[in-house]
Every structure is written in C-alpha cells, then in structure tokens.
Amino acid sequence: ACIITLNEADRIDACLDSLAFCDEIVVVDSGSSDGTRERAMAKGARVLEHAFEGYRAQKDFVVNAAQHDWVLCLDADERVTPALRASIERERDGGFGHHAGYRCARLTEYFGAPLHHGNAYPDRVLRLFDRRRGGWRGNREIHEHASVDGAVAMLAGDLDHQAYRSLPDQLARLDRDPRLLAETPHA
C-alpha cells in the first residue's frame, strides 16, 4: 500500500490498521511536525521523507518507492472496509486476472454522516493497480486520479473517506483548492 502524508497523526493509525493485510506499506511524508512519521513506523510502515512538489508528484514518488508491482494507494483520511479488503484479497489470490487496475466505491463521511446520495456516492476511484501499467497521470494537482493502460474492474465494498476534520478544515480547503486549480497548467 502507498500513502502520502503531512501532519496526519490523528488519522494515520486507522488508515494503517485497515491495511494490515498488505504485504508492504510505504508512507511518503513531506515534513510532518505532529508525530505522523513516528506513528507510521510504529505500525510497521516503511517511511520515506520527500519534499512536497504537488499531490500527483508525491503519489508518483510513493508508487515508485514500492517494492511490489501491484499497489493500493490511499490517502491518510481513507480506510479499507472489511468488505473491500475481502474483495481485494480475492482478486490478489486469483492473480488479478487480466486486469490492469481496480476501482472501488469511495463513501465520503461528512462530519460523521455518510453521503449516500447525489454525486457523492459512489465515487468510483481507481486505487489498486499494476504500477507497470499505470500511475498518477494528467495535469491535475488536486482531485488527481490514477489511470492504467488495460482493463479495469470494480471491487466490491467501500473505501471509507473521512473527508474533513472540522468546519475550519473544510473552509481552509475551500481557500486552497481553487488556488491550486488556478496554478495548474491546462493543455
């Protein structure tokens, strides 16, 4: 599994606990000052430090640091549910078939309430893929997405997404995200 972090000490334990079935967990941290790196190491993750150059670049870096060809990429505010874990393990045990990647339904929780309606669910995200056939591509610096060359299947089970810590956290993102979008070059 591959995770990028910056000051995620309050969330990293639950994320890593949900990945206990993975053969390897790599965390790339971009300068946390809250004990994130230490918590991740205590959970058995291999932790690397890398200066932040953008979300996509950071995710490419962690994928390239993995030792296995198949990688599961999560953000620190995400958790693999038991149903998703079972689905991933079934595919892994079957050799992943002819697929290059797998999507899962991400279920966002908004201050503890799951968003099952509207455009929020299912947010089908490609998070498990063969890194030889894909990665974090495109020119988007926020809401970046992985893509692969080859067939993509859908996994059963949800990826739990604990989007915001608090209302001030959400407001800070509403300030940050448009600036990042404005700085993203467009083709």
Which residue stretches match the model-derived regions?
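A conserved acidic beta->alpha catalytic loop
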Residues: 18, 29-39, 75
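Short acidic donor-binding/metal-coordinating loop in glycosyltransferase active sites
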Residues: 30, 50-52, 68, 75-78, ...
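Acidic helix N-cap motif at the loop->helix transition within catalytic regions
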Residues: 10-13, 34-43, 83-84
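Conserved donor nucleotide-binding strand/loop of the catalytic core
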Residues: 37-65
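Catalytic-site signature of metal-activated, phosphate-bearing donor transferases
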Residues: 60-63, 69-70, 81-187
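Short, well-formed alpha-helical segments that are part of the catalytic scaffolds
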Residues: 3-21
